[in-house]
Structures are given as structure tokens and as C-alpha cells.
């Protein structure tokens, strides 16, 4: 009887041990430790996290940026961070935290902004985001930066969020998209309030000396292609993983996509820069990236 009891006890302990091992190895955002936010991590002896300055070509012109490379040999899933207009809020606090969670993060300035060559335009910036993917998926750059080219995501704020959606929805190499306070020209620049929005944008662009940009041409180019910037329609035709967190009501129609497994639209009570929600925003983004790029059960 004692022998039988010992065998049963051994089997139960073994099952619990195996289950715990399986749980520890499975990427699950609900169980991810937040140590990456709370504590400094011990660097890998041979492949420590670092920063690499980048020069990315877009239509033959140089864009300047840098990579926050993740700790460890990799290759690592990689997030391309897309800034807004003009890019005063770079979200580098998010970049550092996302990197500490095990992701490479790429930051760059679009053509015609902050010293990058060329002319700043909305469509140009969309093309620039795709050029950044081209850069990362080049075999030499991927090896140097330890990029897992099968796990690339866009994360953008404001105008950068609109760019992330419009570029990411069309590029099969981008597996997941995060949009924070999404700038949606299709809803902002037509219908009620459009005239005021256009005037406000033009007046704001006139104050932005860090941009090589003609405000009239910038806006005229958007209006000429407005139908191609219909984010809602493009989302409806895609099964790509998308997280949108807004603090405004310009995209409330996105909520109709919430029943989809790979879509989540939320509205938070905060300001445009999410000033009082930076830690919560970090956790929300990292959990989303974990679920949609690392936890394959949640990826369609």
C-alpha cells in the first residue's frame, strides 16, 4: 500500500512540475512579470542591450535614427516606433521599456524632419515606414541588429499612429500594429469640422521650423489622396493584429471591430501625450505584442 501511495504521489508531483514548466515557457501576457519596468536587469555577457545609430535610405534619401537592441543573442522581435507631428513626443520612455521586455525598438525621423534629408509629406512618411521595414529585413542589417524578421511590429503615436496603420495594413512583413491617439485624416478632413481642422493644421505647420515642409502642399497632397487614407475600410478588410488606444472620439467607429480576436479599440481618459498613463501604456503595448507576435495561439 505504501508503495502504491508513493507511486501516486510521485506521479502527481511530476504532473505539477511538468505543468509549471509548460506554463513558464509559454508566452502569456496575463502572467508576464513586470520586473522589466521595476528592476534593472543583468546584461547578457556576450550580447548586452545597446544603442546603434542608423542611416536608413528612403527613395534615395537618408533618414537618421537609432536602434535600441534587446539584451541577449536573439534574434529578437522588433518594433518600429513612428513619431507624430512634428515629433516632439518621441515616446522613448516606451521604447526603453519595450526593449527591456525583450524587443528591439527602432526610432527614426521621416524625410524632411529633424535633419533627415528630403521633403516632409504624409504619403512620404508612409513610404518611409515601409523603407524602415526594408532596412530591417535586409540580411546584413537583420544580423547586425539581431532582428527576427518574422516578428516586426509598428507602434505609432498621433500622426505616427495613422502612418502605422496605413503602412502596416498593406505590408505583410508587419505582423502587429499599435496606434496611440490615431490621426485619421479621412475623418478629420472632411465633413463637419473639416474646415476648422484644415486651418488649425496649416497654422500649426507654419510654426514647425524643424520640418522641411510647405504647409499648403502638405495638406493638398493629403486631400488629393483622402480616399486612400480610409483607415476604417482598410481595417475591415484585414485580419492583422491591431491595438488602438485613443483619448479622443474621432475613431469611435473602430469599436465595431472589437469582437474580432486580433483587434482591440480602447478609449482612455488622459491627454494627447498620455502624460499620466505612461506605465499603463507600456504594459498595454507589451502585453499586446506578446499576445500577437509571441503567443501564436492568438495570431490568426
Model-derived features with residue positions:
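C-terminal motif of bacterial Sec signal peptides marking the signal peptidase cleavage site
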Residues: 18-20
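N-terminal cap/lid segment of alpha/beta-hydrolase-fold proteins
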Residues: 29-73
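Active-site glycine-rich loops that stabilize anionic/oxyanionic intermediates
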Residues: 76, 83-87
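Conserved alpha/beta-hydrolase
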Residues: 98-117
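Alpha/beta-hydrolase active-site loop
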Residues: 121-143
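Alpha/beta-hydrolase fold nucleophile elbow
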Residues: 144-158
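Hydrolase active-site cap/lid region
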Residues: 166-215
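Serine-hydrolase catalytic core
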Residues: 218-290
Amino acid at each position: 500500500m505504501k508503495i502504491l501511495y508513493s507511486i501516486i504521489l510521485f506521479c502527481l508531483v511530476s504532473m505539477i512540475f511538468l505543468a509549471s514548466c509548460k506554463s513558464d515557457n509559454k508566452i502569456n501576457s496575463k502572467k508576464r512579470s513586470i520586473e522589466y519596468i521595476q528592476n534593472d536587469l543583468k546584461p547578457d555577457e556576450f550580447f548586452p542591450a545597446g544603442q546603434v545609430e542608423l542611416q536608413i535610405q528612403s527613395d534615395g534619401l537618408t533618414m537618421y535614427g537609432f536602434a535600441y537592441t534587446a539584451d541577449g543573442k536573439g534574434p529578437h522581435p522588433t518594433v518600429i516606433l513612428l513619431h507624430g507631428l512634428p515629433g516632439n513626443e518621441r515616446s522613448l520612455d516606451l521604447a526603453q521599456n519595450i526593449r527591456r521586455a525583450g524587443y528591439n525598438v527602432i526610432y527614426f525621423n521621416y524625410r524632411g524632419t529633424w535633419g533627415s534629408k528630403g521633403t516632409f509629406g504624409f504619403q512620404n512618411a508612409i513610404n518611409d515606414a515601409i523603407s524602415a521595414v526594408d532596412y530591417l529585413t535586409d540580411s546584413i542589417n537583420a544580423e547586425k541588429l539581431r532582428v527576427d524578421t518574422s516578428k516586426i511590429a509598428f507602434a505609432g503615436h498621433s500622426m505616427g499612429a495613422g502612418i502605422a496603420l496605413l503602412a502596416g495594413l498593406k505590408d505583410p512583413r508587419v505582423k502587429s500594429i499599435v496606434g496611440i491617439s490615431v490621426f485619421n485624416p479621412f475623418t478629420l478632413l472632411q465633413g463637419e469640422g473639416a474646415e476648422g481642422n484644415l486651418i488649425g493644421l496649416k497654422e500649426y505647420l507654419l510654426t514647425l521650423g524643424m520640418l522641411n515642409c510647405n504647409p499648403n502642399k502638405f495638406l493638398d497632397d493629403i486631400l488629393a489622396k483622402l480616399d486612400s487614407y480610409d483607415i476604417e475600410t482598410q481595417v475591415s478588410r484585414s485580419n492583422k493584429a491591431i491595438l488602438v488606444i485613443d483619448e479622443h472620439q474621432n475613431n469611435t467607429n473602430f469599436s465595431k471591430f472589437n469582437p474580432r480576436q486580433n483587434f482591440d479599440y480602447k478609449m482612455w481618459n488622459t491627454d494627447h501625450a498620455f502624460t499620466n498613463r505612461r506605465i499603463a501604456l507600456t504594459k498595454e503595448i507589451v502585453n499586446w505584442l506578446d499576445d500577437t507576435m509571441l503567443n501564436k495561439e492568438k495570431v490568426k
